[in-house]
Amino acid sequence: MTIIPPGSTIGILGGGQLGRMIAVAAAQLGYRTHIFAPEDSGPAADVSPNWTHGAYEDAAALSAFADSVDVVTYEFENIDPSAVDTLARHGLVRPGAQALRVAQDRLAEKRFVCDLGGLTAPFAPVESLDDLESAVETIGSRAILKTNRMGYDGKGQARLAEPGDAVGAWNAIGRQSAILEGFVTFAEEFSVILVRGADGAVRFWDSPANVHVDGILSTSTAPAGSLIEGQVEQARALAKQVADALDYVGVLTLEFFASADGPVFNEMAPRVHNSGHWTIEGAVTSQFENHVRAICGLPLGETGLAAPRVEMRNLIGDDVAAWADILRDPANHLHLYGKHE
């Protein structure tokens, strides 16, 4: 197993808030970081002085970047896997490209999980309006049409309530390759957040109960209630199967619906995740520190709760203006990362 010692340089694809938090954790452990991003600045620029402005399609720029660092990771999954393949020819990339190929294609993701025995919503591929109308007949009209790629935070989606909604939904997503997912009746949402080391060791954090508003995560609370706790073991077993099948290294998150039939897989993120931000102060070792430990071949840190109850509240837009009120409670911890949108 290759060990990347402190003092080495970690390359990060993407310069957003997740890249920033990875860089902060890396610095704590004595690593330098180097950002590669198509933007010329971003939240990570405040904490990582080394920044390469380049396109993910620029093989020459990627190769030069890979040669300047000791290991590469990424902060989000909407990167062409061929870029990761280019980097891998020059050195270590963790997680690998296969995780991207699965996670950024919703249809491939659902099939991958089903092949491992996971429970998902009923789904069907959609390449045309005719496909959509046929899928509605099979799955039912209470469904969600999602673009097969590039959707996040509720984007690239259209809800259907009756068969007549098919045309409008197809137009709403831009008439592109998609997946129709049947409606799932559920009581709560939760995530399984794990870290897998280069040696195959796996640790899990407590699974938080997640609340979304308009498709965006609002709060994550751990420990979750009894309904979720009763489904965590089964969900963790599936998550470990996914991580092992991908030979995954780093932090991996799977999101689930807690239903009467058990945990229903929704989607996965091959990276640190916003439902795990509470681990910064709320767990013995944060998801960001353990991600750095994993990709560098270091022993994984303990993942237990550092307090009896932890809640993460996501500050969106004007919520940030309440920073002074938030800090009046001495038990609160505020994280602002300079995102301007």
Label each region the model flagged:
Residues 203, 263-267:
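Protein kinase-like catalytic core scaffold
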Residues 102-191, 195-242:
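Active-site nucleotide/adenylate-binding loops and adjacent lid/helix of ATP-dependent enzymes
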Residues 194-198, 256-260, 338:
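Short, low-complexity Ser/Thr-rich regulatory SLiMs
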Residues 34-36, 140, 296-299, 328-341:
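Short amphipathic beta-strand starts and helix->beta connectors
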Residues 306-309, 313-341:
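Glycine-rich active-site loop/lid that clamps phosphate-bearing ligands
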Residues 233-254, 259, 269-320:
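Active-site "cap" helix and flanking loop/linker of ATP-utilizing ligase/carboxylase catalytic domains
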Residues 1-111, 115, 130:
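ATP-binding N-terminal substructure of ATP-dependent carboxylate-amine bond-forming enzymes
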